[in-house]
Structure formats: C-alpha cells, structure tokens
C-alpha cells in the first residue's frame, strides 16, 4: 500500500468519525480538534486496525496524536511504499 492510499483511507475514516468532511491535506490533531476525545480515539484506533488489518502496539497508539502521525505509524507498520 502506498502512503497516498493510507492518507486517503485515513481521511475517509476521520470524515466518518468526526461527522464532517475532512480534506486529504487537512491537518488534524487531538489538541485542535474539539471532537477528538478519548472515546473517539478508541473508536479511531479500532477502526484503523480493522480497515488496515493490523494491530498497533500501546506505544504506537499513544503516538497517534494527529492524522499525519497515524499515517506515518501505519506506513512503518505495514511497510508502505512512498
């Protein structure tokens, strides 16, 4: 899977969970997104693990503080191409 495919799928996931349109190049992080609370974070991780057919470690989950950070972690975790 290529990095842009990861970004596209994450954008779709964030759009569904945040209940608003999220742009692919939009910067989203926990500190600036009022709807990104602990429950949404759990939902996000479970959805990502299901959609990408992977399991993130506790350390990886703790580092998922933005859409870009999550994309980076997934890229490393599943061996994404550039």
Residue ranges and their predicted role:
Residues 32-50, 69:
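Phosphopantetheine-attachment site and its flanking helix in carrier
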Residues 11, 50, 65-67:
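Generic signature of intrinsically disordered, low-complexity, basic-rich segments
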Residues 1-23, 75-82:
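Thiotemplate assembly-line natural product biosynthesis machinery
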Residues 15-35, 51-63:
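Phosphopantetheine carrier-protein modules
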Residues 58, 62-81:
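C-terminal structural segments of small proteins and small subunits
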